[in-house]
Design a protein with these regions (language model features):
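Outer-membrane beta-barrel translocator/receptor signature
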Residues: 1-72, 84, 144, 157-159
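Outer-membrane beta-barrel domain signature, strongest for Gram-negative TonB-dependent receptors
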Residues: 61, 67-178
Length: 178
């Protein structure tokens, strides 16, 4: 599988999308592209994805399983001739959510063990979107990267060089005694 991001265009263009849904879900996406000169073009893109939590955590008395994400990408295309081009791409995205609530479907034999060590399990109402955690889970992730791509057309073959660096900062913590 190869996913290739669209190159910046030498003609101005753009797109905006907005979606609203239940639990105050809001998804926004936008991008713009255009020329800087005869040989340089740019593109900028951004997105936002937010939603209220829809699972009630009885242990900490709040809603969890929310969505809170955003990201940006910028590109510069330098095309000095029809057979040579360079693309510089930088991106960043961030997640800060209280995710991954797992509801109890069946009160099985492990319920007594969970309660014996101080935990609790919501029983008697499968698929009720209720959980019982001892602390608030955390899911904070920042991804970032930069890429330089060079493409040269030699007529009978093409040469592509891709150099890149990626980084991630991840802080996750979850009450996983379900």
């Amino acid at each position: 599988i190869s996913l290739v991001t669209a190159e910046p265009a030498f003609k101005f263009g753009g797109n905006v999308e907005a979606t609203y849904g239940n639990f105050n879900a809001l998804i926004l996406r936008a991008d713009v592209t255009g020329p800087i000169s005869d040989t340089v073009a740019y593109s900028l893109a951004g997105n936002l994805n937010r939603r209220d939590g829809f699972v009630r955590d009885l242990g900490i008395n709040r809603d969890v399983n929310n969505r809170s994400r955003y990201g940006f990408r910028g590109q510069l295309l330098f095309q000095p001739s029809s057979d040579l081009k360079f693309r510089l791409i930088a991106d960043f995205d961030s997640i800060d959510e209280n995710c991954c609530a797992v509801v109890n479907l069946v009160a099985g034999p492990t319920v007594a063990a969970i309660r014996a060590v101080g935990g609790n399990v919501v029983t008697g109402a499968p698929l009720s979107y209720r959980v019982f955690n001892n602390f608030l889970s955390t899911n904070r992730i920042d991804n970032y990267g930069i890429t330089l791509q060079a493409d040269k057309d030699f007529g009978k073959f093409n040469l592509t060089s891709i150099s890149s660096a990626r980084g991630v900062d991840s802080r996750t913590n979850q009450d996983s005694d379900f």
